[in-house]
């Protein structure tokens, strides 16, 4: 046991210096790794808990406790060993609880999968089952191989990319400044540049957040930044005034504050509304240039990462434009990894990472996307396969049925497309740069400045350089690399180690997580006495990174990436491009990258000996090193941006043409198009009598504006059009007091039109918006969905003793073409809405399920149908500015209540005892309301009551009425 006591000496001082709270158990999380909840002490404890068996920790405590002599006994050592041992025990408890939970849920999910696959198998053609199994492209989508349309035949395209978090700019990117500004930022910027240079592409917009915080460069606050491509040019393509690639910064969230990605969720709808305005304006502008006056709508809206995924889904639904999605780092994969560590519970993880919001956004992205772009097959089969909305076997069968023209029973699956990431080839190495091992062909004065900044660390700068480029975060596993280097004397004698860990000023000013990792690295350098053998420069420019690769290649070194999991592996491709062989993690993208490039070795990132052995083997075997270098340079063209864009655009061409419904006969008749302000009444949490009073009082206080035509009204509800008409007739009101009705939970829009010369109720005919019907039919399951829901409804029962009673029944009277209604007998026994949505996704039925009428009715509508989306549709079609819209809601409502609150419109919450108490449909949310709605936003106000004075004051406050 004596050998296992050494960890005490290396960690105890740092733990004690951090204070009593360093590993206290009364905080919400034991070892939170992000956003100010991480300390060096916690990181050290994590290393201990991970690396040592619970029995060893317990024995160490016993030894400390057994020292009875005052000279020998160390009370602090005794206390700390006891506390760390208990942390290890708690870790095992978490692991056991999570294992039980997964074990309990797995049979249910597997049964649903089996039933669905069986349904699909019943109608397969003879021979179809066996044929699919061996075809990887049929398994879940397309790889980059195979026949596809030629990009030269593409019309001039407008493409929209979205990446919301981090610091995004075209030049001098601050990669590594924080956890949100990493490889993804570089990827989307270079993708935008490359696409804009591709044949057939007219304009690419990269939409991100405008940041006006005082501690950040002014460039992040510029509304528009033109991106200049330095890669490949298309001289034959005509360019117009608005062609090219641009970063468009949309203001949303607090104007003077930078937000981490975990805190962006409440402001997503605000971004969507701002992006809608930009896309509509730009489409019309491009149309004037190249579209003969007709708007040129985006060919695709492509979201990157979960937050941008849900934004792209909402934009796709509002505009009826195809959506693509790239997940980058998936929430379920992160959640599973954190739970396996067993250090904190699901609730604690969600508190820190808002992981439930992230996973739901990714599920919704699967629902809405036509294609999902992955970088590797492993990402599809092991990561996306964790999601309710995707399953490899079912995807294979659905793809086969589509190819055969067979019935899919209303089921849909997004196409998974494997397109490896591209890299900029502007700095590709040439053979002559490697000529001469001993003599430098260029004078020292011509060497890039960053070379001297690195070489000054080394006692012997001529040794081969092991290079790592990674942010100082635990998942990058930099400490294991330093340990592997420090513990292998032959490797230390053979090579130097260079760590490019972002830019920093002072460690004390870094975020806690980065500071902890960097402190650990410096401690290890001191412990192994690696001075003169390890370089860790404080600063470098993004433009100097290729020079750093070239320096490592000049010394005949190697690039190493031993992250626990690597999603993309762009740095590996960049290293190969500069003639540098690689040592890479065997988890993630490097596996497939190395299959293509064949330029290095793969290792287990958890095995320090394997890391050291692989590095020594590669650097000591000159023939192996040369072969890896040559293979990398020979095959690197497969990861070029032109190749990436060619594959990308060939997939975009396969998407069905869709565009917003702007134009048509009703534009000339609908009065809504001339309104300055629109008041939307969406109050669900009141009885019909209170709803009528709210309508009357609102119209009363805006009588002057209504008469002048400057203000219009929209009723937004889950009621059918016949129920709305009956309500207004019973109240003695004409339907024409409203400009439009959003009914059936957003699946229908009606306009009240006169059928005679006198304004009587009987002569007002509600005219349905046919364009809206076409707008929302995307992936609607129709009769196949209805049959499955009817079957499901028979299984939802309440039990009284031995008697089972069905509680959900089909309701044809309140159903329509795009709304399947079900009557609920006993809302208290309803399954949570999240479970119903999970079931629909497992069945590949893409729809939006809602509980309404105090959970006495279930409405199932198309995936892009909702009251919130219908409002955006009206604004786009009739040219209404969202900031001029006021939405009236109650204190609660139908299950889509949260969607009505956020955005650029003004929201008035009517508070008071007249509200029906919130029922269980709002008490079983996947995440708290405040996680997705900024209730303290200046766009949201609350009033007590709905009297005329109350309504007048509220409408004056939001600018609909003058003071």
Curated annotation (Swiss-Prot):
Pathway: Glycan biosynthesis; sucrose biosynthesis; sucrose from D-fructose 6-phosphate and UDP-alpha-D-glucose: step 1/2. Homodimer or homotetramer. NCBIfam families: sucrsPsyn_pln. It comes from the Eukaryota. Residues 111-150 are annotated as: Disordered. Keywords: Glycosyltransferase, Transferase. Its EC number is 2.4.1.14. This is Probable sucrose-phosphate synthase 2. GO terms for biological process: sucrose biosynthetic process. One of its GO terms (molecular function) is sucrose-phosphate synthase activity. Plays a role in photosynthetic sucrose synthesis by catalyzing the rate-limiting step of sucrose biosynthesis from UDP-glucose and fructose- 6-phosphate. Involved in the regulation of carbon partitioning in the leaves of plants. May regulate the synthesis of sucrose and therefore play a major role as a limiting factor in the export of photoassimilates out of the leaf. Plays a role for sucrose availability that is essential for plant growth and fiber elongation. The lineage of its organism: Eukaryota, Viridiplantae, Streptophyta, Embryophyta, Tracheophyta. Activity is regulated by phosphorylation and moderated by concentration of metabolites and light. The keyword DNA repair does not apply. It catalyses: beta-D-fructose 6-phosphate + UDP-alpha-D-glucose = sucrose 6(F)-phosphate + UDP + H(+). Expressed in germinating seeds. Pfam families: Glycos_transf_1, GT-B_Sucrose_synth, S6PP. Belongs to the glycosyltransferase 1 family. Gene3D superfamilies: 3.90.1070.10, Glycogen Phosphorylase B, HAD superfamily/HAD-like.
